[in-house]
Amino acid sequence: MSMQQVQHCVAEVLRLDPQEKPDWSSGYLKKLTNATSILYNTSLNKVMLKQDEEVARCHICAYIASQKMNEKHMPDLCYYIDSIPLEPKKAKHLMNLFRQSLSNSSPMKQFAWTPSPKKNKRSPVKNGGRFTSSDPKELRNQLFGTPTKVRKSQNNDSFVIPELPPMQTNESPSITRRKLAFEEDEDEDEEEPGNDGLSLKSHSNKSITGTRNVDSDEYENHESDPTSEEEPLGVQESRSGRTKQNKAVGKPQSELKTAKALRKRGRIPNSLLVKKYCKMTTEEIIRLCNDFELPREVAYKIVDEYNINASRLVCPWQLVCGLVLNCTFIVFNERRRKDPRIDHFIVSKMCSLMLTSKVDDVIECVKLVKELIIGEKWFRDLQIRYDDFDGIRYDEIIFRKLGSMLQTTNILVTDDQYNIWKKRIEMDLALTEPL
C-alpha cells in the first residue's frame, strides 16, 4: 500500500479536514503514518481477512495506532471507530483479532517504559585504531618464509596484541524492550565495529577478480597442518604450483570429481527437460518461439496455453518444447513436404536448445503435448489456416474418408446416394471456412 493511501486512512480515522492540508512530514501525523504502515505490513502475514473485510484493514491499523498514540503521548487525540468501513460490531471484533495476532507475533509481551541501552560509539576506524597486531608485510614474511626463518622470527620477536580500550557500559535495568514506531532511531547512521571488521576481513581475503588470494589459501593450509613447517622448500613450492593450477581452472576439486563421475555414468544433469518445478518467464517462451521463426499470433497462443497449465506442471520445459514443435511442424508443413531433412533439422535444433542429446525425449514431449491440445480451438484453427492435419492436407483426408465418384468401392448408383455424398463433402469443406 502506498503512503498516500495510508495517509488517507489516517485522515479518515482522525476526521481531518482535507482543505486544511495537514503536514504529514513531521509531528504526530508522521509517527501515526509510520506506525500504521508497519502494522499494515505485519498484519498481511498474520491476519487473513475476507474479501469484503480487506478494505478496512488499513483503517483498523490506523485506529490501533491512534489508540496507542492517545494512551502514550497525546491524551487529547480524537479518533473515531465509525470511520472504519464496516459494521461497528464487526469492526470491534476485527480490532480485537488484530491486537491478539500482532501482540502474539511480538517477542515482548509487557511494555516497560525504560530507557533503551545506548550503543557503543567507539570504533577502531574512527578513533585511529588498527585491526591487526603488526604490519601486514612483517606478518607475510613471518608466515610464508622458510621454516628456518619462521623459527628464528618466532624466537626473536614476541607478538603483543594491544588491548582495545574498555567498552563504556551504562547501567540499565534487566528488562529491555523494543523500540516503538513513535520513537526515532537516533543511532541509525552509526557504524558498529564488528561489522566494519568483518567487511574489512572479507575484502582482504578476496582479490579484485572475486577469487581468494593464493597467499591466504597457503596461510590456511599452513595453520591447518602443523607438520608443514618441517617440509623442505621444494615441496612447498610444488604444492603452491598445484594450487595455482587449480585456481586457474576455476573449479574446485569436488565439482571436477562430480562432473567426471557424471560423464562415466552417461547422465546429463543440465537438461532442461528434466528440470523440475522451475518458473518460466514469458520472455523465455517468446525467445524459444523466435528461434523457430513462429508468427506472433502463434507465439501468443503458446504463452496462453502455458499459463493455463503452469500451476500443475512438474517439468514445464516439456510442455513448452512440445507446444513449439507441434506449431512449428504445422507452420512449415509445405517445406517439410518438399524436403524431409527439415524434420531432422528442427528436432536437432530443439535438442541443442534443451541441452539434451536424446531425440526420444523430445519426440515423447511432442506426442504428449499433442494429446493435450488436439481438441483446443486455437490448435484446430491453426491446422485449418495452414492446411495441415497430421502432415496431410484437408482434401486428402476427405478423399481417404469419403472417397470419390471414380473409386470402385464408392460407386454412386442413385441420385439419393449422390446427394448424400455431396452433402457430406460440402459439410466438411464448410468446416475450413472462418466463422
From Swiss-Prot:
Region (Disordered): 106-256
InterPro entries, per the entry: ORC6_cyclin_first, ORC6_fun
GO molecular function: DNA replication origin binding
Biased composition (Polar residues): 201-213
Composition-biased stretches (Acidic residues): 183-194
Highest taxon of the lineage: Eukaryota
Entry's Gene Ontology cellular component terms: DNA replication preinitiation complex; nuclear origin of replication recognition complex; nuclear pre-replicative complex; nucleoplasm; nucleus
Keyword Transmembrane appears in the UniProt entry: no
PTM annotation (Phosphothreonine): residues: 146
Pfam families on file: ORC6 (PF05460)
Biological processes annotated in GO: DNA replication initiation; pre-replicative complex assembly involved in nuclear cell cycle DNA replication; silent mating-type cassette heterochromatin formation
UniProt keyword list: DNA replication, DNA-binding, Nucleus, Phosphoprotein
Compartment(s) of residence: Nucleus
Record's function text: Component of the origin recognition complex (ORC) that binds origins of replication. It has a role in both chromosomal replication and mating type transcriptional silencing. Binds to the ARS consensus sequence (ACS) of origins of replication.
Assembly and oligomerization: Component of the origin recognition complex (ORC) composed of at least ORC1, ORC2, ORC3, ORC4, ORC5 and ORC6. Interacts with ORC3, ORC5 and TAH11.
Similarity comment text for this entry: Belongs to the ORC6 family.
Additional note from the record: Present with 2970 molecules/cell in log phase SD medium.
Protein name, as recorded: Origin recognition complex subunit 6
